[in-house]
């Protein structure tokens, strides 16, 4: 059975890149465009892992992460921030919100897949 990954990303091009990459290694992909949609999708589908953009149109990925991690069923689900935020301290904000890992855009596809596989080992 393939692992389910929820991609919370508002930019269509970025969602397509992530979807194609993840599908190429047989992960099932669920997509969400906003923080609210992402939280709802996480609760409905209980994915094995979440890729979280930080800059979202309604509330940011930090808030979405906090809401997801507040649900006891979803607390153990790993969340990897995949974001263009690369200033000093941005990674700390993500970790404080509950993200388990932090990857900056543009990312290396091989490095991102390696990071994902760490959680499925």
Where are these regions (language model features)?
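Conserved acidic carboxylate
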Residues: 9
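Two-component/phosphorelay signaling modules centered on CheY-like receiver
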Residues: 12-30
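Acidic, metal-coordinating helix/loop segments flanking the phosphotransfer/catalytic sites
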Residues: 31-49, 92
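Hydrophobic residue at a beta-alpha junction
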Residues: 32-33, 45, 56-59, 68, ...
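Active-site residues of response regulator receiver
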Residues: 53, 83
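The feature encodes the CheY-like receiver
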Residues: 57, 75, 87, 105-106
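C-terminal output helix
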Residues: 107-116
């Amino acid at each position: 059975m393939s692992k389910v990954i929820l991609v919370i990303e508002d930019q269509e091009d970025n969602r397509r890149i992530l979807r194609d990459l993840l599908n190429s290694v047989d992960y099932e992909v669920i997509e969400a465009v906003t923080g609210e949609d992402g939280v709802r999708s996480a609760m409905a589908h209980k994915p094995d892992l979440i890729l979280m953009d930080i800059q979202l149109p309604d509330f940011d990925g930090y808030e979405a992460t906090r809401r997801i991690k507040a649900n006891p069923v979803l607390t153990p689900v790993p969340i990897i921030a995949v974001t263009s935020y690369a200033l000093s301290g941005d990674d700390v904000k993500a970790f404080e919100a509950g993200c388990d890992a932090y990857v900056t855009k543009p990312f290396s596809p091989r490095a991102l897949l390696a990071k994902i596989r760490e959680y499925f080992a």
